[in-house]
């Protein structure tokens, strides 16, 4: 009986962390050195497929901002009007359209840090660059230009985070950083959180960008990504409902 259970758990683990491989990848240039990367992957274990859209940028030439959106404006409209180079939907909000967790917009705190099981990290921009920190690592004593609390953590120290849900599949939005000041905003087709963490930690979807940390943003019908091409046209995955805030990237 114990052997049967052991085999069951081994099979479950193999399913959760099946081998994902890149079947195709294309990159295109945007302004200020931002790159849009379109990646298709296949899972050798179960034949599953996933599509990733990434906007890769440098903290040296770009600034990350959190955009409050109390009126429920669409991502594409906001990005075009304010001359952003790329952006995604932001964090969680409640049934009354109020943000859940920390929000710092233009160096002003709109809502405080919240202790909760799901929103375990903070994406922030400071003079030190773009960072993803654990909620317990967050300090209000440093000069912070923008911050949003979200989660769960997907990758830490280039290793996938364990214990993530593997049964619920949905569109996902996420942010990832590496050690040399580069970061990315990302969207992916319907995968579980465990699958997303596994892909980010084990496949080179961002080419030569080595992901050090990654964190989940609001997903499902909220997921959206927008990118301005170098020629002035745009690539866009629209949200399916209004969202409370956005994560955007501007030229410095």
PLM region spans:
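Short, surface-exposed charged micro-motifs
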Residues: 54, 122, 174
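N-terminal signal peptide c-region/cleavage motif recognized by signal peptidases
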Residues: 11-13
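Extracytoplasmic
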Residues: 49-52, 81-82, 118, 149, ...
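Active-site-adjacent helix-turn-beta-strand microarchitecture at beta-sheet edges
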Residues: 91-166
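Zymogen propeptides
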Residues: 16-114, 186
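Sec-dependent signal peptide recognition
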Residues: 1-8
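Beta-strand-turn-beta hairpins that frame and shape the catalytic cleft
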Residues: 50, 127-131, 177-184
């Amino acid at each position: 009986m114990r052997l049967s259970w052991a085999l069951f758990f081994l099979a479950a683990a193999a399913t959760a962390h099946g081998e994902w491989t890149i079947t195709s990848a294309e990159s295109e240039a945007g302004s200020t050195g931002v790159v849009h990367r379109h990646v298709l992957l296949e899972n050798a274990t179960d034949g599953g497929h996933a599509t990733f859209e990434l906007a890769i940028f440098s903290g040296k030439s770009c600034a990350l901002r959190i955009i409050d959106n109390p009126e429920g404006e669409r991502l594409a409209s906001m990005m075009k009007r304010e001359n952003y180079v790329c952006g995604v939907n932001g964090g969680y909000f409640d049934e009354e359209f109020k943000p859940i967790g920390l929000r710092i917009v233009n160096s002003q705190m709109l809502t405080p840090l919240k202790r909760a099981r799901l929103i375990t990290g903070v994406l922030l921009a400071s003079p030190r660059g773009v960072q993803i920190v654990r909620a317990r690592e967050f300090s209000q004593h440093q000069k912070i230009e923008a911050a949003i609390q979200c989660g769960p953590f997907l990758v830490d120290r280039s290793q996938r985070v364990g214990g993530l849900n593997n049964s619920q599949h949905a569109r996902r939005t996420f942010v990832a950083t590496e050690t040399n000041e580069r970061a990315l905003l990302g969207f992916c087709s319907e995968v579980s959180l465990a699958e997303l963490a596994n892909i980010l930690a084990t496949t080179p979807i961002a080419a030569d960008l080595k992901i050090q940390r990654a964190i989940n943003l609001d997903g499902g019908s909220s997921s959206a990504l927008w990118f301005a091409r170098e020629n002035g046209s745009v690539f866009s995955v629209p949200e399916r409902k209004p969202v409370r805030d956005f994560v955007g990237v501007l030229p410095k």
